[in-house]
Amino acid sequence: MAKIKEKFDNVFELDLGDGIKRIGTKSLVPNKRVYGEKLVNVKNTEYRVWNPNKSKLGASIINGLKEMPIKKGSKVLYLGASAGTTPSHVADVAEDSPVYAVEFAPRIMREFIESCEGRKNLFPILGDANKPEEYANIVEKVDVIFEDVAQPNQAEILIKNAKWFLKKGGYGMISIKARSVDVTENPRVIFEAQKEIMEQNGFKIVDAINIEPFEKDHMLFVGIWNGQ
């Protein structure tokens, strides 16, 4: 029998009795898998296992994220939605609150739209995260921005979007992929430089999590937005 313990608001530790560390979210749309994830039923509630190998946010939770800014009722802007793996879990956590998810590639967006089926709080936006003004008529002020965009100007993208959409005192979460910034530089140097860009432009960094072994040369930063 699986054991369930709430780790963060609407994020659960799942003990399936095999010693493997797992987390999951309550299924907003029961019996629907988004990326082949395992479904677990406990006391008439279905949970979706959150695979850290396919989600940087999932990996950061497994690796010791101190605080989860995304909670029930959080309004979220998600940059770099891809096919919807992580946004679907974020939508589970937020429950009735909107998750605006931006993806640049039309082909991937088609897959993402399929994963949105039945999720009334998950809104797919075909757009360029570098140009927040393009979706400013759709997205309202949000509590959290999560970014997973493999571009050299990753930190700047977060700042641009924060200026448009993030409430003062809200949270920015960003998965920095060192190799997307500079292939030749030491990842630690890149992480420090990206952190500095954020700190100089309105964010107070409150957590940093290395997400190896799930992703190589990736660091997830959490910052509080002081506004600019």
Swiss-Prot record:
Keywords assigned by UniProt, alphabetized: Methyltransferase, RNA-binding, rRNA processing, Transferase, tRNA processing
Disulfide-linked positions: none
GO molecular function: histone H2AQ104 methyltransferase activity; RNA binding; rRNA methyltransferase activity
Methyltransferase is among the record's keywords: yes
Binding sites annotated in the UniProt record for S-adenosyl-L-methionine: T85, T86, E103, F104, D128, A129, D148, V149, A150, Q151
Record Pfam families: Fibrillarin
PROSITE patterns given in the database record: FIBRILLARIN
Family that this chain belongs to: Belongs to the methyltransferase superfamily. Fibrillarin family.
Protein name: Fibrillarin-like rRNA/tRNA 2'-O-methyltransferase
Annotated organism of origin: Methanococcus voltae
Name of the gene this protein is made from: flpA
